[in-house]
Amino acid sequence: MAKAKYERTKPHLNIGTIGHIDHGKTTLTAAITKTLSQVGGAKATSYEEIDKAPEERERGITINTSHVEYQTETRHYAHVDCPGHADYIKNMITGAAQMDGSILVVSAADGPMPQTREHILLSRQVGVPYIVVFMNKTDMVDDPELLELVEMEVRELLSFYEFPGDDIPVLMGSALKALECGCGTRECEWCKHIWELMDAVDSYIPLPQRAVDKPFLMPIEDVFTITGRGTVTTGRVERGQVKVGDEVEIVGMREATRKTVCTGVEMFRKLLDYAEAGDNIGTLLRGVDRKEVERGMVLAKPGSIKPLTAFNAEVYVLTKEEGGRHTPFFGGYRPQFYFRTTDVTGIIQLPEGVEMVMPGDNVQMAIELITPIAIEEGLRFAIREGGRTVGAGVVTSLNE
């Protein structure tokens, strides 16, 4: 078969392997690259290379993550795999590796285990929208009824956490056997299962909406006045696009929002007709006084986001070694919450039955800010104390 050349025209998705330790996530990642390398869709990456994941820093937190890339006939994928359980938690909460979908690896010999459950819950909490299941190590199970039983258990667990357990594709195979064989053909007893998995990922996980197609939002980083022209706010467009003449809403830091019109957009001192996600811009706002706008607010498409003070979140608390707290904290703890461009004080309420939170824990909590911020589900934040990061979190639901 002719080598597939990397076409930038293929749509791009971010995915990753999740699941319990030793169920075969890293072996599967290696097997996917090995199988696809046979048709020129990847560079074969060994288990050892993936396992020695380099350290990365995201929001002041060190995370070990391995990235591989590969492509099928229709898509290009960036795939993340983490060596340790704590790395997964940190990765998912900080959004260091935003996943459009994930491959849940479950050992057919063991069935779902505690981290299987925890990774499914985290996926639900942080908004990983789609899961495909790979039941691994089927070569170690002789009894087909046992396989059916494990599949049923996995589907029930997914349904429990509000994923469509009955509809999710569940594929079976042995990542190790496919990796050892390495022929990569669809006819092969072991390699064919890797192809079946990739076909399922291709067809079941839809393409994500591009940032540019979402409603406009720009966190305000700075504000200044141009004499005779008016007030300019600067920042990087997070999503969507803004055109000269568009109505925009200023949201956050106050109870009320304020609508205005964007009368000018410039980037690198050049005037533009419009700007889109990723651009660093200055926007001229009609009739807005310098005192009415400050860092920490956002410019957004009117009605697309509200200023709120109360929300629920999933939080990872840094360990002492990571530069976090040395001692636990309790309900009523009042740190700073850093959203986008600014710190706001908030009060933490712990769930019933949770007395205290230790460094290294991940926990669900309710938070009440003293100042309203433009908040939505999936928004990431850091928890800071005296200028240093002590935790990272993601908004899971809003309390209006």
From Swiss-Prot:
Residues 10-209 form the tr-type G domain. Residues 81-84 are annotated as: G3. One of its GO terms (cellular component) is cytosol. Keywords: Cytoplasm, Elongation factor, GTP-binding, Hydrolase, Magnesium, Metal-binding, Nucleotide-binding, Protein biosynthesis. Residues 174-176 are annotated as: G5. GO terms for molecular function: GTP binding; GTPase activity; translation elongation factor activity. The keyword Metal-binding applies. GTP binds at residues 19-26, 81-85, 136-139. Residues 19-26 are annotated as: G1. Mg(2+) binds at residue 26. It catalyses: GTP + H2O = GDP + phosphate + H(+). Residues 136-139 are annotated as: G4. Monomer. NCBIfam families: EF-Tu, PRK00049.1, PRK12735.1, PRK12736.1, small_GTP. GTP hydrolase that promotes the GTP-dependent binding of aminoacyl-tRNA to the A-site of ribosomes during protein biosynthesis. Belongs to the TRAFAC class translation factor GTPase superfamily. Classic translation factor GTPase family. EF-Tu/EF-1A subfamily. This is Elongation factor Tu 1. The gene is tuf1.
